[in-house]
Amino acid sequence: MATVRGALVLLAVGLSVAVASASAPAAPRADASVFGGLGTWVDIYDGALFAAPEQTASRIAARGVKVVWVETANDRSAVDVVRPAELGRLVDSLHARGIRVVAWYLPGHVNHGRDIRRSLAMLSFRTTTGQAFDGVALNIESTRLRNVAVRSRRAVDLARRLRTAAGETPLAIVPFNPRGLERRPSTWPRFPWADLAAISDAFAPMVYTGGAFKGFDATYGYVTRALRLLRAQTGNPDVQIHVAGGVADRLGPEELAGFVAAVSDDGGVLGVSLYDWATTRPAAWRALKPVSG
């Protein structure tokens, strides 16, 4: 009888915890405006940019950029933060020019512990002057883990852990291009849009058209469809979006015009950029002027 009574007590406690958890209010969202305005991207392969961080920051500022997305590592990197000293100098130099810096990490979902550690490293990172990133982002695009169900669970768990640890630091998801997944759904069936939307503060889809879609109309239609799909898949017509086009040096004048027109006509995006800084030519910067805020 004592055993039964003890089991009932444990069951009651478990139920009360579950009910409390279910009824607990959702964590307040952080300020997504960090991801707003004209942006650009830097990845871990841009060694030349890190060789002279101050000059890089000066050139970025001259283009009127408001937010720089900087990759700290990916799941195959040898360390949790690549080039930390040079990265710190870049962050300090960008901040000195009034430019926000968002760190992003590309998880592979194969080694979940490593992905967790490297994601949290974005939050703990400090420059030599004590400065931190203004926001963090997870690039949920890797398909290295072939088990789709496990991949999705780990992606959502990783985002949830990072969101919990981030507090007031905003979190963005850099997802698969929604139009690309519509065209090739086997890439990531049942991508966890709604779960990630419930956790994050914004999305930054990389809506690449360069090389595959030629001309104004094809580019315009693709980008417009991608933005509509993102809102539909997340179930939130007001989801905060920073849209990234690209790859920058594969977009000709007509494609650039189509991308800019699609973003302008949409009228609901938070920010805009081309991937990436190293491949964005002067003509592309001029083309972005109408949507640079």
Spans of features found by a protein language model:
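Aromatic-lined substrate-binding rim segments of carbohydrate-active enzymes
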Residues: V70-L106, R146-I173
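Active-site groove signature of glycoside hydrolases
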Residues: K66-R76, M122-S152, S273
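Short, acidic/polar
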Residues: Y45-A62, H112-T129, R184-L196, G252-S264
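Bacterial N-terminal signal peptides
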Residues: A7-A20
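Aromatic-lined carbohydrate-recognition surfaces of secreted/lumenal glycan-active proteins
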Residues: T40-D46, R100-H112, A155-R190, P237-R250
